Every structure is written in C-alpha cells, then in structure tokens.
C-alpha cells in the first residue's frame, strides 16, 4: 500500500498526469441543488481548491458516494463499496470529462483507493491529536471514521479486478458514443 499511496503524486511530479484545478472535497453535500428541478446549481466549500490530479476528486467522490454506510458507522460489516454505484459514477464521470488522458483513465480505481486510505489516515491522525480538525459529535467519532475508511479500502482491494473491468467497460462505451478521452 505504501507505494500506491505515493503513486499519484509521483505521476504528477513526473509529468505523467496533468495538473488540474481540483476541489479536493467532492462529496454530495458540497453541491447545491435547485429545489424544483433537482439539478446541480453550483459547488460550495471552495477553501480546498488547488492544483492537483482529477483522480483526487474522482477518488474522493467514490469514497463518499459508493460507500454503503455512513462515514462514521460503528458496525463495520455494513461498510463496503457498491460496485453498482461505482459503475454509475464512473460512467457519468468519463462521459462528462472528455479531456481525461489515457493515464488518468487507467488510474481511476487507484484514485478511489488512495483517497479513501488518505482520508482514513487523516481521521486516525485527528483522533490521535485530540479531534482538532474534523468536527465530532461524539467521543471516538474520528476513530470510527478511520475504521470505516480502512474497511472500504479492504473491500476495494477485494473488488479490484472488477473495478478495473468496470472502468475499462465504461471508457470503451464512452469512446463508442464519442464522449470520452484525449
């Protein structure tokens, strides 16, 4: 896992991945929706915007959106990564982002894994440091968050081949529809 954690930054540093504007907190509650049309209006919480990899935003979205349980769920057997949600999000993402490079497309699953592991480490670090960064509403909440993220990483590893297969299928479908890729 150690090599994987550095892989995206190493690829950016080597020029293998393009530097893009990234939000870095791409979860659903950072999107405002129109109450009538239910269409997205804008993205909020812009304090985390900076240069980075599109894989950071994709990965964080998968971490949050494909999880089958709340981020602070205490019953870890409820937490896994939904392959159905992974597929639907990936389909939308590759079709909405036609400028993604082949290397970015190949690394989409790794983006999900890296961002999930990173969040787990951040939650654990915050718990150890006295819960100063992430707000908590109960004792041990950040530790529970760390546990769920690590469980999610383990589930991604178990489903790794299927994740790569889904990305390949969705990229191929998007290419056939003329809505994908450099």
Where are the regions that the model predicts?
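ATP-dependent phospho-/nucleotidyl transfer catalytic cores
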Residues: 1-23, 28-42, 135-143, 151-154, ...
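Catalytic activation segment of kinase domains across protein kinase-like and atypical kinase folds
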Residues: 15, 29-70
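Active-site capping/gating regions of soluble enzymes
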Residues: 26-28, 33, 85, 105-108
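Phosphate/dinucleotide-binding and metal-coordinating scaffold of catalytic cores
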Residues: 48, 65, 72, 109, ...
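All-alpha amphipathic helical-bundle segments outside canonical DNA-binding/catalytic cores
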Residues: 100-112
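Long, compositionally biased intrinsically disordered regions
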Residues: 156-160
């Amino acid at each position: 896992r150690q090599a994987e954690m550095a892989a995206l930054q190493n690829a950016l540093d080597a020029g293998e991945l393009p530097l893009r504007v990234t939000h870095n907190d791409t979860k659903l509650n950072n999107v405002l929706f129109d109450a009538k049309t239910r269409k997205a209006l804008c993205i909020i919480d812009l304090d985390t915007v900076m240069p980075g990899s599109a894989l950071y935003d994709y990965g964080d979205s998968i971490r949050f959106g494909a999880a089958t349980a709340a981020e602070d769920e205490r019953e870890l057997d409820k937490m896994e990564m939904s392959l159905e949600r992974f597929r639907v999000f990936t389909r939308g993402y590759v079709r909405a982002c036609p400028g993604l490079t082949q290397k970015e497309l190949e690394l989409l699953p790794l983006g999900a894994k890296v961002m999930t592991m990173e969040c787990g480490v951040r939650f654990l670090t915050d718990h150890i440091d006295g819960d100063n960064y992430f707000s908590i509403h109960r004792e041990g909440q950040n530790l529970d968050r760390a546990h769920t993220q690590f469980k999610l990483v383990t589930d991604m590893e178990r489903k790794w081949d299927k994740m790569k297969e889904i990305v390949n299928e969705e990229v191929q479908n998007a290419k056939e529809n003329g809505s994908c890729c450099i």
